[in-house]
Structure formats: structure tokens, C-alpha cells
């Protein structure tokens, strides 16, 4: 699909737009991640080694459509953030400039925040992001940045509670643990629950800025 512009257009027109229009007022749909870990599509022969240009075209068109039809946020869960969403002079494959160029200058072709992933095997790239700022981690800092995927059991030598609090203190805008239902050895809600409850207790106004414990129905 990504290698065919017509098929990208068909996906956006026939799926992305109807989906967004249908659910744009649902308070539970706050963001759409347009692709999980596209790094592997680019690097791994088994995943096609698809050029970034083709992936960028898809993201640009889909993001522009989502922003045209809704206020839903858009991101891409890049696995190796310091490698592919790096601050200058590094390479940011999903920068505003790149995406606009793939969408004929459409300013709506953009991400709303970055969401790099982190697992301990990635420590050799630029160490553990929880214990440094996004800038120190080497990321482009022109948007908010969320750690979009991390083991629910926490990073090496740290508890999830330590990871969450340190991410906040270092200026990260959120953390999303993998996974809720324990499909692998990375953990489940049982592991990350104490961390999220501790964070809520320490920063309740931040977690519930409107004083509501659940989105209005």
C-alpha cells in the first residue's frame, strides 16, 4: 500500500476520514498513532525496507485529513527516537517541514507530539530517556514528547514508579506502558498500576485538570 500513492489516497478517503468523522466527538479518542515503529519498515528487509519518502507521504496525507475533520491529535510511535526524530543537525523523518513537503505545503500535515519508544536494548543508542530531558536524549524539542511505549515492569534497575516520576521531572509529557494485558514478558497493568496510582496521588491536579475523574459521556 505505501508504495502506491493511489492506495494511500484510497485508505485516507475510505477509512481514515470516515473513522475520524464517526468518532471525533468521543472523548476517549484523544489521539491516533498512524504507524507503530515505522523504523522497521525502513530498516528490516522482512518488513520491506520501504523508503522514508513513501511512509512520509502516507503520514502527511492522513495527518492532514485528520486535522481537517477533527481535533483529534496525531502522532507516530517511532521506536528509535534519537535516530529518527533527532534535533538538528540530526534527522527528523516526521518533521513539519518534511510532512508539509509531502502534502503540497498543507500546514495540517503535521504531528501534534512525538512519541518515541524505549526498551533496555536501546540504552546503547543514548542511554535511558527517563533520567534525562528530551533534549539531552537527542530529540527534536519543537513539540511535546511522550514516551510512547516502555515495559510495564519498568526499565533496568528502576521501578515503574521511579520511571514515571523521573520522566515528569525531566520534562516528558507522558508515559504509556506496554502492555495492559500481559501478552509478553514486559508486564501488565498489575505491574504498572502502582506507578500510575503513585503519580496520580502526587500530581492529581495535573492528571485531572478539570476535576473530573472520567471524560463526560
Which residue ranges define each predicted feature?
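Active-site mouth of glycoside hydrolases
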Residues: 1-111, 121-125, 140-143, 154-178, ...
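Substrate-binding cleft of secreted/luminal carbohydrate-active enzymes
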Residues: 116-118, 143-217
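Alpha-helical scaffold elements lining the catalytic groove of polysaccharide deacetylases
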Residues: 124-136
Amino acid at each position: 500500500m505505501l508504495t502506491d500513492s493511489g492506495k494511500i489516497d484510497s485508505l485516507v478517503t475510505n477509512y481514515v476520514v470516515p473513522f475520524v468523522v464517526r468518532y471525533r466527538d468521543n472523548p476517549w479518542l484523544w489521539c491516533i498513532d498512524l504507524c507503530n515503529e515505522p523504523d522497521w519498515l525502513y530498516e528490516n528487509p522482512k518488513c520491506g525496507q520501504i523508503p522514508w519518502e513513501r511512509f512520509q507521504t502516507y503520514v502527511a496525507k492522513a495527518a492532514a485529513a485528520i486535522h481537517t475533520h477533527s481535533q483529534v491529535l496525531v502522532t507516530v510511535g517511532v521506536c528509535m527516537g534519537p535516530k529518527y526524530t533527532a534535533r538538528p543537525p540530526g534527522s527528523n523523518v516526521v518533521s513539519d517541514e518534511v510532512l508539509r513537503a509531502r502534502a503540497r505545503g498543507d500546514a495540517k500535515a503535521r504531528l501534534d507530539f512525538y512519541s518515541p519508544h524505549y526498551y533496555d536494548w536501546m540504552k546503547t543508542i543514548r542511554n535511558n530517556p527517563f533520567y534525562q530531558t528530551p533534549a539531552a536524549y537527542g530529540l527534536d524539542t519543537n513539540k511535546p514528547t511522550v514516551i510512547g511505549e516502555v515495559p510495564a515492569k519498568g526499565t533496568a534497575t528502576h521501578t515503574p514508579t521511579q520511571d514515571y516520576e523521573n520522566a515528569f521531572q525531566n520534562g516528558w509529557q507522558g508515559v504509556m506502558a506496554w502492555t495492559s494485558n500481559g501478552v509478553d514478558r514486559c508486564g501488565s497493568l498489575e505491574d504498572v498500576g502502582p506507578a500510575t496510582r503513585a503519580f496520580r496521588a502526587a500530581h492529581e491536579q495535573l492528571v485531572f485538570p478539570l476535576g473530573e475523574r472520567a471524560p463526560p459521556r
